[in-house]
Amino acid sequence: DTLEYVEKNIQKVSDADFVTLPEMFCCPYEAKNFPAYAEYEKGEVWQACSLMAKKYGVYLSAGTMPERDSDGKIFNTAYVFDRNGSQIAKYRKSHLFDIDVKGGQSFHESDTLTAGDSIAVFDTEFGTFGICICYDFRFPELGRLMALKGAQAIFVPAAFNMTTGPA
């Protein structure tokens, strides 16, 4: 079970202040899978991440997960939890990754995901941080906007691979 694996590994590094998980850590990273794995905010995966942050006393940048909203739209959403398990940030990926690699892989997040339209910045005792997701990082304006809101560093949960990374 993925959540058991995540907890086992958070336990190994529980003396850390921050733990970060990868993009779509809780489901196979294929656009066709996102609807089946999508949960409403505060669903099972969200609850588990909140509990792990509290149990191990860490800030948890909980990678990303497919989030379904009340209109049925699905977003690639990142949540950040503080040491008490409280959600302190939520960010929905705004730059969806659509690619057709010549002679190779084809992947279109926009087939199933909806783009977000906000930025996320959060405060900790270590400073102010921003969060964006994977392909978003290639758009410097997003980082600039986070910096203008006080972000001193940016978390970037990502799932680049050897094919999509250079693309």
Regions found by a protein language model. Name each.
Residues D69-K149, P157-A167:
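Active-site catalytic loop in hydrolytic enzyme cores
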Residues D17-F18, F129, A153:
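Structural motif
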Residues D1-L3, I154:
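Contiguous N-terminal and early-domain "leader" segments and peripheral loops that mark the onset or edge
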Residues L3-N84, K90, I99, N161-A167:
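Cys-nucleophile CN-hydrolase/nitrilase-fold catalytic domain and related Cys-dependent amidase chemistry
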